[in-house]
C-alpha cells in the first residue's frame, strides 16, 4: 500500500516528506479497537519509520489534522468460508486505506487476510466497558471510506466531516484505557462540543468516565442520552451480561451493578416517546441453535419484564423475540469479553 501510494496527490506540489496520522484501526463490524488492531497500528508506524522515509508519522491530534495530512485508516472484519460477514469467523479481512485530507481523496488501498489464530479480538478497555452499541455515522463513514473503495475515490463525507472530533475521541480513548478518567471526561466533553461531536461513542465515553469517577447522577443523565440516540437511530444494543446458559444476570457487581440504572432509564425514555419496541435477545454461536433461540427469547423476556414493571404503559408497546446466533457481530464463539456484543439485548423501534 505504501509503495503504491499515488503521491503527490493530484493538484498538490511534491514534497520531500508527507505527514501521516493514523486514525486507530477498528473492527469492521463493531467499530471497536482490539488488541490486534492496536498492534497493527504500531506495526504500520514502525514500517513507515524503517522502510518508507517519505512518510513522516505524526500524532493523530486536532492540531495535526488541521494541517491536512495523509490519514491512514484500516478495518479488521471477521468473515466466514465464503468471505461473508455472517456466521462464525473463519478468517479476517484486513482493509487499509491512505487518504489525503488536502484533496479529499484516497491515494492508496491495501487488502489482506489473516487466520483467526493470529488475531486477538479482545477489545480495549473503553470498548469492553461501553454499555451499549448503536449505528454511528462517524464509524460508518470510517468503514465506508476503507471498504469497497479504490485509490482515487473521494473520502466518505460522514468520515471527513467528523475527523476533528475523531482526533479528540482517539485521545479520550487512550486516556480512558490508561485509567486517566478525568482527562478522558474532559476530552470527550471537548469532542461533544465540536460541530460533529454528537456521536454515540462520545456519549458512551462521557457515561463511562463519569461512572468511573463515582458521579452516578451525571452518568445516569448521559445514559438517558445514549438511549435517546439509539432509539432515534431505530436500534439500541445493550450489553446485559448473563450467566452461562441462564436468564439471570451475572453476579459480579462490577459488571451488573449499573443494570438497574440502565433498565430504569430505558423504561423512562421509552415510555415518554410513544414508540413501540421489539426487544430481541442474541447469543454467540456455541451450542445447538434451537437451544440458543430459546435462550435468547427467554433473556429478552427477562429484560422486558422489569421495563414493564417500571412503566406499565410499555406492556402494550413491546414484544420479545429471540434470534439465537443468527445475527452475530463478532462471531468468534469465544464467550468472553471479546464477543459480548453477540450476547446483546437489542431494542428496535417498530410500528405500533
Q: Residue ranges of each PLM-predicted region?
A:
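Short, surface-exposed beta-strand segments enriched in small/polar/acidic residues
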Residues: 15-31, 236-246, 263-300, 318-331
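C-terminal/domain-edge helix-coil "capping" segments
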Residues: 1-15, 101-190
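A structural "domain/chain start" motif
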Residues: 1-42, 150-165, 170-171, 224-227, ...
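Alpha-solenoid helical repeat scaffolds
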Residues: 123, 169, 200-205, 237
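Periplasmic peptidoglycan-binding/anchoring modules of Gram-negative envelope and division proteins
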Residues: 1-13, 247-280, 305-309, 347-352
Amino acid at each position: 500500500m505504501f509503495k503504491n501510494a499515488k503521491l503527490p496527490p493530484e493538484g498538490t506540489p511534491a514534497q520531500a516528506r508527507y505527514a501521516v496520522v493514523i486514525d486507530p484501526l477498528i473492527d469492521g463490524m463493531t467499530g471497536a479497537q482490539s488488541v490486534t488492531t492496536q498492534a497493527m497500528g504500531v506495526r504500520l508506524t514502525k514500517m513507515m519509520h524503517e522502510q518508507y522515509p517519505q512518510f513522516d508519522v505524526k500524532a493523530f491530534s486536532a492540531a495535526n489534522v488541521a494541517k491536512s495530512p495523509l490519514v491512514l485508516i484500516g478495518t479488521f472484519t471477521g468473515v466466514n468460508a465464503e468471505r461473508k460477514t455472517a456466521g462464525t469467523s473463519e478468517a479476517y479481512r484486513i482493509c487499509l486505506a491512505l487518504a489525503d485530507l488536502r484533496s479529499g481523496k484516497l491515494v492508496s488501498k491495501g487488502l489482506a487476510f489473516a487466520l483467526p489464530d493470529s488475531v486477538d479480538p479482545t477489545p480495549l478497555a473503553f470498548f469492553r466497558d461501553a454499555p451499549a452499541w448503536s449505528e454511528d455515522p462517524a464509524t460508518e463513514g470510517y468503514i465506508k471510506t476503507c471498504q469497497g473503495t479504490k485509490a482515487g475515490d473521494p473520502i466518505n463525507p460522514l468520515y471527513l466531516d467528523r475527523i476533528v472530533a475523531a482526533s479528540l475521541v482517539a485521545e479520550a480513548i487512550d486516556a480512558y484505557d490508561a485509567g486517566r478518567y478525568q482527562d478522558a471526561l474532559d476530552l470527550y466533553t471537548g469532542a461533544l462540543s465540536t460541530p460533529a461531536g454528537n456521536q454515540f461513542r462520545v456519549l458512551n465515553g462521557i457515561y463511562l468516565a463519569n461512572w468511573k469517577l463515582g458521579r452516578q447522577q451525571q452518568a445516569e443523565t448521559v445514559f438517558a442520552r445514549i438511549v435517546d440516540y439509539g432509539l432515534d437511530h431505530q436500534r439500541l444494543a445493550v450489553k446485559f451480561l448473563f450467566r452461562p446458559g441462564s436468564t439471570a444476570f451475572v453476579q459480579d457487581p462490577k459488571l451488573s451493578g449499573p443494570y438497574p440504572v440502565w433498565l430504569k432509564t430505558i423504561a423512562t425514555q421509552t415510555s415518554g416517546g410513544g414508540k413501540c419496541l421489539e426487544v430481541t435477545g442474541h447469543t454467540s454461536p456455541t451450542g445447538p441453535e434451537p437451544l440458543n433461540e430459546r435462550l435468547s427469547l427467554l433473556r429478552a423476556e427477562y429484560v422486558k419484564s422489569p421495563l414493564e414493571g417500571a412503566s406499565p404503559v410499555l406492556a402494550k408497546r413491546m414484544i420479545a423475540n429471540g434470534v439465537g446466533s443468527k445475527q452475530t457481530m463478532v462471531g468468534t464463539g469465544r464467550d468472553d469479553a471479546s464477543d459480548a456484543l453477540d450476547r446483546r439485548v437489542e431494542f428496535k423501534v417498530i410500528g405500533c
